[in-house]
Amino acid sequence: MYYYKLKKKTIICIEGKDAISFLQGIISNNTNKLLNNRAIYSTLLSPQGKLLHDFFLFREKNKIYLDPVDSGVEKLNEKLNLYKLNSEINISKKKIFSYFLFFGKSINKILGLKNKLGEYKKLSYAKVFNDPRNINLGLRIICNSKKEDVEINKIIKSKKLIMNYDEYEKTRIMNCIPDIDKDNLYNNAYLLQYNFENINSICWKKGCFIGQEVTVKMKNRGSLKKKLFTIKSFTKKFKSPEEIKYKNQIIGSTTSHFNNIALALLKINKISNIRKKNKVIII
């Protein structure tokens, strides 16, 4: 079992009587799923349907917390305030003390979580939740004080967790999980192209959200020409970006990688005859 301590220092808090309805009208997932014991994953798109932000959400009473990548906090905060208009909400940035990833087989049991996507608990020493995208990505831990951080480090020591971010990256790529920074997705990616439909970021039944029209049209028309896949080579290590060829034809390019595995945006009509193993394309 493994852990990694991120350099993350800020999350966003939205509170007020219109908090749920405000988010419901702009993000791709359904805020009605956001219970006190459940975290969800969602995105905020441009009106043209391209990805601007992705984030986890969890709720504590009348407060909703958005947990984006650190590089996206400022832009997301600005965008939320732009859309706020007359909504009776308060949007603020909240400092945190530390942020951990725990991952590996049955890792959730260490902190008393079930093997359930998005399960959330506020413990006496931290906020913890299973990653709602894919259970193989383990759990996330937010500490608000040095005291909480010390408690988590005691658990790391007692359970003999190994610090290894490379193992996390390997798991992310093998499960075809895009990363907005590493895969260069900001304002470049459509959700259906980059596997967001399969990592619990979209609710098709919730009603309108920003960028919905473009996203729904792509789904209904089946107009995708390229899609994100996990690829693997037994003969080389990948780079990113790197052109991917099959029978001397360019079929796509990598977006992020770890040694001999990578995420790659590939032409759908060019991969039908390529060998696959457990949904991984062998190049």
Language-model segment annotations:
Residues 1-205, 209-283:
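Basic, glycine/lysine-rich polyanion-binding surfaces/domains
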